[in-house]
Amino acid sequence: MSTRLGELVERLGGRLIGDADIEVVGIAPLNDADASHITFLSNPKFRGQAAQTHAAALILSAADDEVVAADYQGARIVTANPYAYFARAAQFFAALHAHIAPAGIHPSASVDPTAQIAASASIGPFVAVEAGAVIEDGCVIDAGCFIGRDARVGSGTHFYPRVTFLAGCRIGARGIIHSGAVIGADGFGFANEGGVYIKIPQTGAVRIGDDVEIGANTSIDRGALADTVLEDGVKLDNQIQIGHNCHIGAHTAMAGCVGVAGSAIIGKYCTFGGAAMVLGHLTIADHVHISSGSMVSRSIREPGQYTGFYPLAKNAEWEKSAVIVRNLATMREKIRELEKTIKSLGDKPE
């Protein structure tokens, strides 16, 4: 199925230079695109490839257009943010070619009579929906998912096969949860008495906002008393662990294998590189960016980019090293002052 280039620009905006009646079927990389595709240029270092692409149309910035236009023969869509435009165009074509799940409940699904399932929702094979659960308009619940007692799934949300969404958990509209994710398992809560661990019942839930995406095999634990919270627009990659009672601010994104210990509070618009670690009971400000593999061992009160990693050592040795490293800048200034003093003493006549 194809669409006119002019129709695409009418939907997504941008300034079209070229034939609006060109038919395109999708998006392809610069080197692979042919006359049925559009492509995009978001990094100036690929201007040479963009000029030689065989795509029907090229998405690019005004600055890149000034350089590429002389050599590229196809249509051009000029926009302030080519990468964001590419993302929206990709969504458009994905929807154009997507399989539409049929509304209704598969005969093999097990749905409690007290559960509320919207008529437009799609419930796949071998799905289990427990008592009091609510599944709103346009939801797609793929094969083998489990939705627990009194859980709520917001409109337009898609659960891929084998998602586990346990009792009392909530997710807002337009969410995506990928296969193998477990939402609402017990948090890791125990009291120690005489060397024996006593389990603390985890009676909170998980509360997730709108437009949240959760990757495959990611686990988000329910709160001990209050809820674990993910605000609107949070994006979690695969195999992430979010401990109980954490609060993740809106539009924060985490790459694969990030671990966040219980009761951490993370601000809005933060990013975490792969395998970053956050210790429990910390607070991280808005607009903080943590590099891959870093360990956050203290609260961060100011926005910015943070990086930190030490080799494994005995804890006492590690703490001493951390203090030394943290004070290196001050020590350097003191050494400079000492060098100046020594030099001035050496310059004095005997």
Curated annotation (Swiss-Prot):
It catalyses: a UDP-3-O-[(3R)-3-hydroxyacyl]-alpha-D-glucosamine + a (3R)-hydroxyacyl-[ACP] = a UDP-2-N,3-O-bis[(3R)-3-hydroxyacyl]-alpha-D-glucosamine + holo-[ACP] + H(+). GO terms for cellular component: membrane. InterPro entries: Hexapep (IPR001451), LpxD (IPR007691), Trimer_LpxA-like_sf (IPR011004), UDP_GlcNAc_AcTrfase_non-rep (IPR020573). Catalyzes the N-acylation of UDP-3-O-acylglucosamine using 3-hydroxyacyl-ACP as the acyl donor. Is involved in the biosynthesis of lipid A, a phosphorylated glycolipid that anchors the lipopolysaccharide to the outer membrane of the cell. The gene is lpxD. The active site is at residue 244. Belongs to the transferase hexapeptide repeat family. LpxD subfamily. It is an enzyme of class 2 (transferase). This is UDP-3-O-acylglucosamine N-acyltransferase. It holds the Pfam family LpxD. The keyword Phosphoprotein does not apply. It comes from the Bacteria. Pathway: Bacterial outer membrane biogenesis; LPS lipid A biosynthesis. Its EC number is 2.3.1.191.
